[in-house]
Swiss-Prot record:
This is NADPH-dependent 7-cyano-7-deazaguanine reductase. Gene3D superfamilies: 3.30.1130.10. Its main location: cytoplasm. Pathway: tRNA modification; tRNA-queuosine biosynthesis. Homodimer. GO terms for molecular function: preQ1 synthase activity. Substrate binds at I88, E89, S90, H228, E229. It is an enzyme of class 1 (oxidoreductase). Pfam families: QueF, QueF_N. GO terms for biological process: queuosine biosynthetic process; tRNA modification.
Length: 281
């Protein structure tokens, strides 16, 4: 159980509660979760964040009406800066997007500007929004994380409770730069405890991290209850704390739920994330 699971900000969320679906635009449906909620227990504060990054959302179920009442569809990509005050709760995001369904907008740019304005106001931070017609993205290849996959190791695991101590002593003497990938990341929603499935790429330069220890650590998230963004920041923080790499990037891409996927990344070096969807997305 996360130390902040009873935080008052969580009690106000619609997540985990019966809700009505609204067909007409309503920005008040968006709900924020303070990033400080999970950062402060990790010793992370706005004036000394050890990383930069973003939460990249893909919107697969976005529709509105044009001026003639004809439904329009697009795929959206949102990038929310990690230094925003709040993250955006995903169920509220879904409800907000549903409120576009029967709302007339003059054109696609009006939809984009509305999304950017509302999301920035909710997150209290910088947001970029891109909307794509379907013919712009049809036929795009499935992407893959570059790096050595950790998942084929012949090891026995019998504990699935989160334990950062797997990384204790995991940093070796050899100095390397490598990318490591696992598709076994699984955590659970902080509120509903529904499973969240993801793939994670860890790129670092520094003392070589023991691959078995790192895989055991990642598998230990299996019963852990935390939002996607919080899990990625926890992974970044734990690797920095125990292994002390010179540079580190953690990038996770989660499978979609409710027409949305969330893909957070955190880094202390130059990094440009590839945003193509993975096989399970």
């Amino acid at each position: 159980m996360s130390s902040y699971q009873n935080h008052k900000a969580l009690a106000e969320l619609t997540l985990g509660k019966p809700t009505a679906y609204c067909d007409y635009y309503d920005a008040t449906l968006l709900q924020a979760v303070p990033r400080s909620m999970n950062r402060e227990p990790l010793g992370l504060y706005p004036d000394n964040l050890p990383f930069h990054g973003a939460d990249i959302w893909t919107l697969y179920e976005l529709s509105w009406l044009n001026s003639n009442g004809l439904p329009q569809v697009a795929v959206g990509e949102i990038s929310l800066n990690a230094d925003s005050i709040n993250l955006i709760e995903s169920k509220s995001f879904k409800l907000y997007l549903n409120s576009f369904n029967q709302t007339i907008f003059a054109d696609k740019e009006s939809v984009r500007m509305t999304l950017q304005r509302d999301l920035a106001a909710c997150a209290q931070g910088n947001v970029s929004v891109a909307l794509y017609d379907l013919d712009e993205i049809t036929g795009q290849p499935i992407s893959n994380f570059n790096g050595e996959c950790l998942d084929k190791q012949d090891i026995r695991i019998d504990s699935y409770e989160f334990n950062a101590d797997y990384l204790q002593g995991a940093a070796g003497k050899d100095h390397v730069e490598e990318s490591l990938v696992s598709h076994l990341l699984k955590s659970n929603c902080l509120i509903t405890h529904q499973p969240d499935w993801g793939s994670v790429q860890i790129h670092y330069r520094g003392p070589q991290i023991d691959h078995e220890a790192l895989l055991r650590y990642l598998v230990s998230f299996r019963h852990h209850n935390e939002f996607h963004e919080q899990c990625v920041e926890r992974i970044f923080n734990d690797i920095m704390r125990f292994c002390q790499p010179e540079t580190l990037t953690v990038y996770a891409r989660y499978t979609r739920r409710g027409g949305l996927d969330i893909n957070p990344w955190r880094s202390n070096t130059d990094f440009v994330p590839l945003t193509g969807r993975l096989a399970r997305q």
